[in-house]
Structure formats: structure tokens, C-alpha cells
Amino acid sequence: MVLADLGNQLSSALRSLNETTIVNEDTINQLLKEVGNALSKSDVSMSLIIQMRKNIKDKIKLDQMAAGLNKRKIIKQVVFDELIRLLDPGVPLWKPTKGKSNIVMFVGLQGAGKTTSVTKLAYFYKKKGFSTAIVCADTFRAGAFDQVRHNAAKAKIHYYGSETEKDPVVVARTGVDIFKKDGTEIIIVDTSGRHKQDSELFEEMKQIETAVKPDNCIFVMDSSIGQAAYEQATAFRSSVKVGSIIITKMDGNSMGGGAISAVAATNTPIIFIGTGEHLTDLELFDPSTFVSKLLGYGDMKGMLEKIKEVIPEDSTSLKEIAQGKFTLRSMQQQFQQIMQLGPIDKLVQMIPGMNQLPQLQGNEGGLKLKAYINILDSLSEKELDGKKPITQKRIITIAQGSGRHPNEVVELLEQHKTFEKLIGKGGPGGGLGSLMAGKGGPKNMEQAMKQMNANGGMQGLMNSLKGMGGMGDLAKMFGGGGGGGGGMPSMGDLAKMMGGMGGGGRGGGGMPNMGDLAKMMGGMGGGAGKGGQNGFPNLDLD
């Protein structure tokens, strides 16, 4: 993601505070200069940068700070809060109501990714348990209905359109009426786009808006226009009641920061950002989370929510892992669940400190996991459960049945042995296996770390992950078993961090399970004074 460059520059500016022996006005001015330059390169409006600098200066009064206060930490927290404020219009997001028809109308210029975003949004809410449908009211662009039909079929979403009716208002009204009668909960109307803003486009939007009476009108814009997003968003808002904005193509240009800050200045909330071409490449936009990931603090709350979506707490494989067992069937189930979490490179971005990680090559890790799953699918039931050994002859047969090379089968079996050894050493209810299952406490974390250090530490684990593809850079990131490289915490630091995250889960009062951990993460932010904002944890920003 090109925005990573902005994140690295901002992180570098904040880290420079640690290198100064004395914190004074000159230190603050230099910090604000570096932050301002980084934002300017991302096409953030100079007027917004000047205002942000003023806000920071007004909040940091060095001569009024009590002796003994950590000035560096306070300054970093103020900068963090003001970056959030820069991107947050302070307007609540629209949320659909379960059990009733919610009509959503999409508007935007041609080429902004509007039709693709329509399908992504329908798919997003479908995964949340809503019944969804798409109405193609774009009768202007040739091939628009074909695109909707193709996308909707791929996402398994109901759709409506017409190859003969040329009046977009009639198509929109008819489609909405059909799905309302069916009780569809989210009906998304895709409207025509243009290559430029013109009176004909705006008049058509007004007519469709009057006909379908949307609960939310979403304006889709391309992030590459940078701060010009302000004028574009303002123009559309003057014609229809735009309630939310989706900013697309955030994965491919350096103007995203400018676009987001410009839109926030219009007091219109950004509801999603598009980060790729896949159906799942649509992320809920939260200013606090966005800045957190940008600065390398990660999004553990979001990561836990993703995990909870695909891994039930009563999973048989998790129960076996908690008992120190890790069969090939366990591995198969874990791989399948990892695939459901989305591209590995995007998952890695949610882990604190990973903004320093070189970008993984596409979805290389995902492709390797798919290959492994194909191999595991070719195993017999007894082989999966560890009740029958896999001979050299069977390796050849498995390779032929899965369409893979025998070396890949051997590689997979070696990966399994590594993880089986790590998980099994803790025994029932202890060590790494119990932690993976979401159980155990700080002592368990310590035990798990000892297990891992005995097997080469984090480096040993990462070496075993290299075979999955796309994980080589991740292995480099962690350095040796005793200490983290590239600014990442060492194994000891990681154990302390996890041990101090809060005790008491269920049972023996140790590490909370997945459900409790998600609740705990959700409650880490808030508060006044030095506390985080908008649910962001009170991180030690030193």
C-alpha cells in the first residue's frame, strides 16, 4: 500500500523525539515540520496542515507541564489525536436496520470503481447476515448490466436489471419494489456515472433519489484525485443527500491521505475504503484504526474480529490443539480458516510494528496455502488423523492426486512435524497449543516462549513459515530467537506484553479466550487525559 510511505515518514518523525536529549520548542517545531512535510507529500491541503499544527501547538504547553511528566509521550499522544481529528468529520456512520428493507443508492463519476464497490458492499453485509440485492439502474454505460450480473453471480447475490428499458428511473423503481416485496434487507441501487460532473448526471440522480427514497446515498470517489476530493464531494452533496462516502483504490496511489482529509473537511463521513480488486477488499473506515495502522500500532481489535468470524470457539481442532495434539486434520482446518481471513499481506498489516515489514508479493502466501490444502484434501481419513503413516509410495500418489510436486508433499509433512513438536511439548492445557486455542495465562505464555526458544525462537518458527510462501520477509523481520529485529519486540518483551494485557479469563484466571479478548480489546481505549481516543489503546508511545 503506497500509504505505507506516509506511515513510515510519520513514524520516523515521532521516533526522532527519542533521539533528542532536551525537549523544547525547537524540538516541537522540528517535529511539526517533518509531520507537515509527510502530509504534504500525500496531497493533504496546506490549510488543513497549518490548522493541525496550530492545534498541536495550542495543546502542548511545555512550560505548564509538571515536573516528572513524560513529555515525549504526551507530545506523541497529541500528534496522534490530531491526526485522527484531521480525518474525522465527527459525524456518526449510517447503519442498516435488521428486519427491514434498507435502500442504498450509489452515485459517482465513471471510472471511480462504483459498480465494483456496489458488489463489495452487498457481499460485506451478506457476510454480516443481511439479505442483500443489487439493482442496476445504469442504462448509460454499455456493459454496465453485464458487469453487475457477472459480479453478483460471483458473490452469489440477487440482482435486477433490464436490457430493454432505457429509463434509469423506471429500472430503479421496479427493481427496488421487487426486492422490497421479497423482504430483502439491503437493496443497493447502482446509478449511471459520467466522465465529468454535468447537469444531466445530477438531474438523473435527483430523479432516481425521488423515485426510490434511499435511506443512505453513498458517493464513490477515486483516491487518486487527492485534495480535489473536496470540490467533487461538495458538488455531489449539493445535488443529492449524500450521507456516506467510499474512497476507492487506496492500495495504488500516494494521494489517499489528501483525499480522506479533504472529504472529512466536507463533514461527510467516510464509511468504507477500497483496498484492492477482491470482494473482501472493502474495509470499514475508522479514523482511529486507520491512523493506528498507518503509524504501525496495528489493529488487533480488527484482527480478533476477523478471527472470531471464521473460527468458532468450540472448534474440534482448537480443542485438540489445547490438549497438545496437532494432527494433519488440525492443520487442514487451520489452513482453511486462515484462508477465510483474507490475504495474508493484509492480515499482517493488522499486527503492531508490521508497518516496517517489506510488502509481501501479492497473495503469494495464500497461493501456497491453497496448494497445501489441495495436498491435505488428497489424504485418507486415517492419514489425516495420524492413524496411518504416509509412506514414500503414498507421497507420490498424493502428489499426483493433488496436482502438486512430491517435494511439496514432503515440505508440508515437515511443516506439520515442526508445529506438532511445538504444540505437543506443552502437554494438555499448557504451552503454545493452549495459547493457540485461546486459553492459558501469562505463565502459559512464558512456557510457550520457552518451547519456541528451544526450537530456535521466533526465528525457528518463522523459518518453518517460510515454506508457506510470502513469509520470508516476515522471518527476516523478527531476527533471532532472543531479540527482535527492525524495531519489533523481542520474545521476552512479547511475553511481558501479553502477560500484562489483563488477567482473569475463564477457568484458571489466565489469558482470556477469543471472545473475552475481543471484549477486552474493545474496552482498552477511551478515557480522558493521556488515554487513547475512539477505542485506541493507551499505548506506550515511547
Curated annotation (Swiss-Prot):
| Compartment(s) of residence | Cytoplasm; Endoplasmic reticulum
State the EC number(s): 3.6.5.4
Q: Which InterPro entries match?
A: AAA+_ATPase, P-loop_NTPase, Signal_recog_part_SRP54_M_sf, Signal_recog_particl_SRP54_hlx, Signal_recog_particle_SRP54_M, SRP/SRP_N, SRP54, SRP54_euk
Root EC class = hydrolase
Annotated residues for binding of GTP: 108-115, 190-194, 248-251
The UniProt annotation puts the region (G-domain) at 1-295
This chain's protein is named: Signal recognition particle subunit SRP54
Species this protein is from: Dictyostelium discoideum (Social amoeba)
Lineage, top ranks:
Eukaryota, Amoebozoa, Evosea, Eumycetozoa, Dictyostelia
